[in-house]
Regions:
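Short hydrophobic/aromatic beta-strand micro-patches
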Residues: 12, 71-75
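Short, conserved charged micro-motifs
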Residues: 18-19, 77-81
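Vicinal oxygen chelate
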Residues: 1-7, 30-71, 81-107, 118-137
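Conserved active-site tyrosine of GNAT-family acetyltransferases
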Residues: 19-24, 84, 111
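Short, basic/low-complexity N-terminal boundary segments at the transition from targeting/disordered tails
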Residues: 7-21
Length: 137
């Protein structure tokens, strides 16, 4: 097997319109491709793909049950949390600070956990390596 990169992360969602509003209008991810039952969001790297749960395997619980957490790097986690609170987004865990940076956890409309991470290490675009100690729950 010769995997080149992660292409997308697919979320089975209960209401694709509500999820599109959350990820596009509230979070700010641009729409890359949109079809009737599939939406790709993002610009570079892996895409976030939304697909109706009714057209996939049975939707079983939330991300705590399934172990799924989405991670977004942010420039300023405090301003991100403040903005999302104003937009009515559920803050699952407020900001904590560790050696690697600051982190908060929010919930999407289907209960998926989303980590907002502001790194303090040199490579500000680094996706991993700085999450030690940041458990979602």
């Amino acid at each position: 097997m010769n995997i080149k990169k992660v292409g997308n992360v697919i979320l089975a969602v209960k209401d694709i319109d509500k999820s599109l509003q959350f990820y596009h209008e509230i979070i700010g991810l641009p729409i890359k491709n949109q079809r009737r039952s599939w939406i790709d969001l993002g610009t570079t790297g892996a895409l976030l793909s939304l697909h109706p749960a009714s057209l996939t395997a049975q939707h079983v619980g939330d991300s705590i049950d399934s172990g799924i957490t989405l991670g977004f790097l942010v420039g300023d986690v405090q301003s991100a949390v403040d903005e999302l609170k104003e937009k009515g987004v559920t803050i699952h865990r407020d900001i904590i600070e560790k050696d690697a940076g600051k982190n908060a956890i929010i919930l999407d409309p289907d209960g998926y956990l989303i980590s907002l991470f502001e790194p303090i290490f040199d490579d500000k675009d680094q996706q991993t390596g700085g999450y030690q100690g940041f458990t979602p729950a």
